[in-house]
UniProtKB/Swiss-Prot annotation:
Removed propeptide positions: 23-41
Organism this protein belongs to: Odorrana hainanensis
GO terms under cellular component: extracellular region
Tissues of expression: Expressed by the skin glands.
A GO BP entry: defense response to Gram-negative bacterium
Designated name of the protein: Odorranain-B1
Length: 63
């Protein structure tokens, strides 16, 4: 029982950190008027680039 609690606690902790970072980025984005920079566009393109194959393969530059 204790061995399953550690990974779950770690996942919960990492999820909370991730949500906090997203909230900070969202707040910062609202402060600067919601303008999208070129870097954010590139980052979003790379995030959505993974296919559902097993193992996942990146599609660098291909859409």
């Amino acid at each position: 029982m204790f061995t399953t609690k550690k990974p779950l606690l770690l996942l919960f902790f990492l999820g909370i950190i991730s949500l906090s970072v997203c909230e900070q980025e969202r707040d910062a984005d609202e402060e600067d008027g919601g303008e999208v920079t070129e870097e954010e566009v590139k980052r979003a393109a790379l995030k959505g680039c993974w296919t559902k194959s097993i193992p996942p393969k990146p599609c660098f530059g291909k859409r």
